[in-house]
A protein has these predicted regions:
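Conserved SAM/SAH-binding loop
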Residues: 13-22
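Short, flexible loop segments at the rims of nucleotide/cofactor-binding pockets, characterized by
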Residues: 11-13, 35
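Conserved beta-strand segments of alpha/beta enzyme cores
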Residues: 9-11, 58
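Glycine-rich phosphate/adenylate-binding loop
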Residues: 27-31, 35-185
């Protein structure tokens, strides 16, 4: 739908994202979209997307629990956005939620792609995450964004935005200084 609406010719490439793909300037992604089910996979993505030479400008990560989800659009490296000119870049999911990188987050629950996972995940939690992710991409393509993430709780029937706002990021524990080139002299 995004291709049709915006006249794009994107291809989805569902494959393991490793260091060679991250730096492949011929085919490396501009936007990496991840839906992983282990801390190890997310650590590998984090390492590959943050490495020098990575082509990915954005990282859209979707994660879920039994009745909740987080959808976060971040930037592994600085990229000029008018709304961020003083702060450099959008924090990624692994910066907002560093516990997602920790080994104890590993579990033996079935994969998101396995039918039996419905016993450990709500039936519609993945659908909700995908809908919010699609909305974030739609807004990004249309112009400046005011939110770069959403936290979803299906049990309470609530969703909350993650605003593009350094004060909000501080509540997540992010203390980022302005990039050197943007500091007042």
């Amino acid at each position: 739908r995004l291709n049709q609406y915006f006249g794009l010719d994107w291809d989805a490439v569902p494959q393991h994202y490793d260091a060679s793909l991250a730096t492949d300037h011929g085919s490396g992604p501009s936007i990496a979209i991840s839906c992983v089910d282990s801390a190890r996979s997310r650590r590998d993505l984090h390492r590959n997307l943050f490495q020098r030479g990575s082509r990915a400008t954005y990282w859209l990560d979707l994660g879920n629990t039994e009745s909740g989800a987080q959808v976060v659009l971040g930037q592994p490296k600085p990229y000029p956005l008018p709304e961020l000119q003083e702060w450099g870049r959008l924090p990624c999911v692994t910066e907002l939620f560093p516990q997602l990188l920790e080994e104890q987050q590993e579990d033996d629950a079935p994969s998101c792609s396995v039918r039996i996972s419905l016993q450990s995940q709500g039936l519609f939690v993945n659908d909700m995450a995908v809908r919010w992710a699609s909305q974030l991409l739609y807004e990004l393509f249309r112009g400046p964004i005011r939110q770069h993430g959403v936290l979803v709780n299906l049990s309470s029937k609530r969703s909350g935005p993650i605003d593009v706002n350094p004060a909000v990021w501080k509540r997540f524990g992010i203390r980022r200084r302005k990039p050197r080139g943007l500091q007042a002299e």
